[in-house]
Amino acid sequence: MSTALAKPQMRGLLARRLRFHIVGAFMVSLGFATFYKFAVAEKRKKAYADFYRNYDSMKDFEEMRKAGIFQSAK
């Protein structure tokens, strides 16, 4: 004679699944945020710093003025 199967625990099933998935989602989002910071944001920040280190705004302005972009600065 076989014994009866144990009944599955139904109480708190949703809360337990949500807790597990919320922790997983938090870990994935934290990992992606870290990846984005180092793969995209740091490179972009370095590119901006390199550009503005050698940028001459007056030279750029004079080139645009000579090209006739500005109507008020002849």
Swiss-Prot record:
Pathway: Energy metabolism; oxidative phosphorylation. Coiled coil: none annotated. SUPFAM superfamilies: Mitochondrial cytochrome c oxidase subunit VIc. Residues 2-12 are mitochondrial matrix. It is a single-pass membrane protein. Keywords: Membrane, Mitochondrion, Mitochondrion inner membrane, Transmembrane, Transmembrane helix. Belongs to the cytochrome c oxidase subunit 6c family. This is Cytochrome c oxidase subunit 6C.
